Amino acid sequence: MISRRYFMMGTAVLPVAACGTAPEKRAGTAPGEVERLASTIQAMRADVDPEEASRAASIAFAHTRALAIQYQITDPPLVHNTKVNMGLKPRGLCWHWAEDMETRLNAEGFETLEMSRAIAEGRGFRIDHSTAIINARGDDYTNGVVLDPWREGGTLFFAPVAEDTRYFWEAREVVLGRRQDLRSVAG
């Protein structure tokens, strides 16, 4: 039997369920965006290999598009999340994007770059949000660059962590550890 909550979510989603444009029909990456991301990655530290920065940027944009097609993104992020949670779409929650982006870029075996993950905990009306971060090898995630394809519904957002004013990012392991501690105390 369908719960009231899922019925209400479905009712809210139906009017906009077919409003979006399929990702394969959207315009591609804006001119200069790959180069801008490559420059942002390279600017993290002097020893970042320019070829690796360029390759990482190119892959990040291409993989965002591939995931948007795979996840069947046609809606804004929160509408898509509702569809995933209702079983209408296969994947596409923010942590799916972060996990898949991290896995893809880690597969490159970069020598001067590495991936990490961060979470912005929900406060007030906001929900938790996860993202992938690319950093210079051995550096702290706070000096890295946010790679967030979820935020704009299958269009890659990127910015240095310190310049991303929309979210307060914390290392994923710190947030998950804090939650585990809270469960232990409550449990």
Predicted segments with their positions:
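Bacterial Sec signal peptide processing site at the extreme N-terminus
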Residues: C19-S39
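A recognition module on extended beta-rich or small alphabeta surfaces enriched in W/G with H and D/E
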Residues: D139-G187
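Solvent-exposed, acidic/flexible segments
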Residues: A46-A53, G87-A98, F125
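Hydrophobic/aromatic-rich core segments of domains that either
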Residues: N106-L156
